[in-house]
Amino acid sequence: LEDRDASDDLLSDRGFLEAFGSACTLLGICLSQRPIEKEASRARSAIRSVDVARDWPLGGSDALALAADLIARGAEEDERTLDLEFQRLFRGTGMRAAAPFGSVYTDRDQVMYGWTWMELRAWMRMHGIECASCENEPEDQIGRMLLLCAALASRDSALIPEFLGRHLMPWAPRFFELFLGDMRTSTFKGLGVLAQATLDDACALLGIVPARFRLYR
């Protein structure tokens, strides 16, 4: 942390924690559940109901303006189109341009359930954190990691800097770079821009300097 006192103050600020938690909940649902599922549909509708450029709680103005434009353009995309895109991005077999699992980036063999996943699991056990199973996917799936951010914001905010700095942000920027370059729908591109902007701003506000890992993708 660059400024521990400032970080501690923000982590005890109820307004910040509620804003960060709500943002991560909506984004995490959209990036972990099929668009045809009711909860994902509600989360998508909630984001579309917000003036993202003006009222989204975290993110730089340029990124939020871009996200708002993309999400607005994506309003014409139907659930079937979005579901096919979700399956291609998150559930398809074979090599994906942007694998949504952290250890694919940090493990030399580019595999799921790699060493950083094991480290994350050990960290979660040490702090008594449970993560509900999600179709047999590892906990370091990007949407599940956002949902874990939300859980920490509501239950144990002091763990947020370590979680972001050690377990998510060492690889998330590379994921978003590849993810945004592989988009075929405006909706998911907008969600990706919004998620990246939210995490980047939270790290900046909290003074988090992510750990440096060698990335293999």
List each model region and its residues.
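Surface/interface-facing alpha-helical segments and adjacent flexible terminal/loop regions used
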Residues: L1-R217
